[in-house]
């Protein structure tokens, strides 16, 4: 898996967690107290940016999950 593919997988994971919690991107921004905007959330979720570990940490706090949840990728690597 190359970097671009990995970023997309992580972004999909962030998005699925957010949606499972019935939160909008704007809700997440509000919980992060202005540290990030909806454009950046969208870019993370689409895999178009490589966020810092601090951003991922703050995102995990906003979504009330452990940061490791973003990187739990076993389901993406299972053979069909």
Please provide the spans of the model-predicted regions.
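DNA major-groove recognition helix of helix-turn-helix
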Residues: 32, 45, 55, 71
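Alpha-helical residues within the helix-turn-helix
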Residues: 19, 30, 61
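A short, Lys/Arg-rich alpha-helix, primarily the initiator
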Residues: 1-20
């Amino acid at each position: 898996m190359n970097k671009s593919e990995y970023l997309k997988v992580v972004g999909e994971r962030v998005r699925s967690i957010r949606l499972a919690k019935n939160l909008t991107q704007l809700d997440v921004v509000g919980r992060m107290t202005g540290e990030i905007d909806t454009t950046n959330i969208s870019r993370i979720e689409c895999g178009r940016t490589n966020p810092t570990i601090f951003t991922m940490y703050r995102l995990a706090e906003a979504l009330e999950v452990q940061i490791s949840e973003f990187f739990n990728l076993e389901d993406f690597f299972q053979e069909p």
